[in-house]
Amino acid sequence: QRDLRMEERYLKMMWQLRPLGIIYTCNPSHCFMELVGEIAEQIPVAIVNNQNEKMNVDAVELDNSKLGRVMAKHLLELGHRKVAYIAPPLTARQKQRSKRVEGFLKEYEKVGLRDQVIIKAAKEEIDLDVAHIDSEYKIGYELTKELLKETTDVTAIVGLNDMIAFGIMDALHEAKIKVPTDVSVMGCDNTLFARMHNMNLTTIEHFVTFKGRDACDIIMKKIATHHSTNTGAVPISTYHVE
């Protein structure tokens, strides 16, 4: 969820604030890509997310397609054939969400099980509302309730992230469905709550802390070299998506 007006206001503020560097923790909205490119010509900018081939801006890439593939491979290895995937709105301005879902679907398609994956995404207008701390939790909870009315034969339910997965788990608990005995639940992000001992949640770690450090390294190097442009990929730290 993001507020386009707020994003535009903050971007325009950069010309007056003139910070030493800017770290963008998500892909810029499509309508602001040109503006971000103009800012990057004057101020060091690093983006943490899916690198956009249309932008000549340094990025620490979060490969959401790979994350989706890793999630699917794990479930397939455990024998899960009929699964559901619950996500926030899969809109054009939130492409990283779609990439994660697409990666997941590709793995199931490889083994001829694409039609065994149920995708339930929240309605697009939800992204227009102001995000609350429990917004994603509610998506997981409410869409799981809907799912259980439609089918009861899935053996695993995936949440786009851990907060959605928590909502999934609560909806299953209310329906007297045991996790992971009856249905397995998987999230992504390895948040603090997902690591609690009594939380039967499988989650994917993709080292966000390291990516933030890498983005800082990019900014510092650009400042030190007077905002020179890298001619190729410069690896900073190495880590596995699993």
Each PLM stretch: what is its role?
Residues 1-2, 27, 50-51:
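Short, ordered loop/turn segments at secondary-structure junctions
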